Amino acid sequence: MKLKIKKGATVQVITGSDKGKKGTVIAVDANAMKIQVQGVKVQTHYDKKDGLLKKEGFIDYSNVKLVEAASKEKKTSKKATKSKSA
């Protein structure tokens, strides 16, 4: 299924323990309908080499709302810019 929320978009959590928090989307798993948001659902993992690591966990797509979509910069060719200025 195609999701409207893309990597780099700003979202707000609407349910759960992190309700009200805003952050940018780090990763999207469209098959599982899960997204990873910076600063939301931070989990602690233990690694023998590095010790305790804090990492964001995935949350369900339905638990967030889109605040600001990821912006795509339009790529213009050199021909298009020359013709506009002439």
UniProtKB/Swiss-Prot annotation:
InterPro entries: KOW, Rib_uL2_dom2, Ribosomal_uL24, Ribosomal_uL24_KOW, Translation_prot_SH3-like_sf. GO terms for molecular function: rRNA binding; structural constituent of ribosome. CDD domains: KOW_RPL26 (cd06089). GO terms for cellular component: ribonucleoprotein complex; ribosome. The keyword Transcription does not apply. Transmembrane segments: none annotated. Pfam families: KOW (PF00467). GO terms for biological process: translation. SMART domains: KOW (SM00739). Keywords: Ribonucleoprotein, Ribosomal protein, RNA-binding, rRNA-binding. Gene3D superfamilies: 2.30.30.30. Signal peptide: none annotated. The keyword rRNA-binding applies. Part of the 50S ribosomal subunit. One of two assembly initiator proteins, it binds directly to the 5'-end of the 23S rRNA, where it nucleates assembly of the 50S subunit. Belongs to the universal ribosomal protein uL24 family. This is Large ribosomal subunit protein uL24. The gene is rplX.
